[in-house]
Design a protein with these regions (language model features):
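Acidic phosphotransfer microenvironment of two-component signaling modules
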Residues: 86, 108-109
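STAS-typified acidic loop motif
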Residues: 2-34
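Conserved catalytic submotifs in the C-terminal HATPase_c
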Residues: 12-13, 52, 108
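Short acidic/polar alpha-helix capping motifs at helix-coil junctions
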Residues: 1-3, 10-11, 54-56, 74
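Short acidic-hydrophobic, aromatic-tinged amphipathic segments that line or gate anion-handling sites
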Residues: 102-106
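Amphipathic alpha-helical interaction surfaces in cytosolic regulatory modules
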Residues: 23-100
């Protein structure tokens, strides 16, 4: 079963950076959900999520971000996706989520969204 690898770091200006690699689906979404919950508990609500190495995302995986964006925005933050792979971006488009989330091609562009 494909897995999910996550890396988290804190950038200047209180921005949290998460890099996801592998598969974000019904079997792995709880890992991402737990990481975002931990970041929120630390008071970080500005998230850049790099999806360049994410091979697959299901509706359950995308649902993690749908559930988190309201809390982020309610606390003065947001979620910005950095360099989503074409197949991942297509899932966001098909689910109608591209209108809700911001996407960036460079880290500077992503940081400027805040």
């Amino acid at each position: 079963m494909p897995d999910l690898k996550l890396h988290q770091d804190t950038l200047p200006d209180g921005i949290c950076y998460i890099e996801a690699e592998g598969y974000l689906d019904a079997h792995t979404f709880e890992e991402m959900e737990a990481l975002i919950a931990a970041v929120f508990r630390q008071g970080c609500y500005k998230l850049i999520v790099r999806l360049e190495k994410l091979d697959y995302i299901s509706s359950a995986g995308a649902g993690v971000f749908v559930g988190a964006i309201s809390r982020a925005k309610d606390n003065g933050g947001d979620i910005v996706f950095l360099k989503p792979s074409p197949q991942v971006k297509e899932v966001f488009d098909l689910l109608g989520l591209s209108a809700i989330f911001q996407f960036a091609e460079t880290r500077d562009e992503a940081e400027a969204c805040f």
